[in-house]
Amino acid sequence: MKVIFFLFTLALSFDSFAQTNKDKYHFFELKVYEYSSLEQEKVIDEFLSSSFLPFLHKNGRSKVGIFSNYGNDTSAIKKIYVLIPHKSLNEIPVLQKAFFQDKEYMAIGKNYVDASSSQPAYNRITTYILEGFRFAPNLMLPNLKSGNNDRVYELRSYESASEKKYWKKVEMFNEGGEVDLFARLNFNAIFYAEVISGPTMPNLMYMTSFENMNDRNEHWKAFSNDPKWKELLSMKEYDQTVSKNVTTFLKAKAYSDY
């Protein structure tokens, strides 16, 4: 009888968890558009602001982040980053198909949708599929006072030499307390996530935000000097868990929800 009661209680707990999390967006899609001309940038911007973003809003994505490189971007290949939340992995292909079946938004985005092979709207798209960390599963909005021109969004990708070292780094963020440290120091995180599909696995990604570049530098100085961080650095189990750190500074597009 006790076993039956335990199983019944456990079932209720799982049901309660499911009800609590059914409206949560724990999966993220990070689409990176690569382009090389001002004409392409104009077409992509027009498509995202007038067609794709309104479509996403219509389909329940009220907070979508759209970013470009911070500062004077002199690189030959430029990029626009689009961060889209999802409730499940199944929603990703479903949403993509839904857009190309929506005649209204297809018509609005005609210049992008019907771009020719001789004048493509972009060079390539790289897509990362992400799952929010167990200690920080959702997208978060920053609490910043500065305007878009000053704000700095810092996207980091930590690559690991092996899956074992990767999972130790994920543990370091979660159970190890690195996520809590970022929160305590007010890093205004947008997300922390495992990369479950992407071109540089095994790796994790996260994004933090700041009032300006000076504010960013001061935050990282405080982080480096914090006793908790020094404690984590001294732990052998977390040694050499990151083999490559790719840091990208971004600014939000004027039409971004961030």
List the model feature ranges, each with a label.
Residues 1-24:
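Bacterial Sec-dependent N-terminal signal peptides
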Residues 19-106, 111-229, 239-258:
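Short S/T/G/P-rich N-terminal loop/turn motif that feeds into the first structured element of a domain
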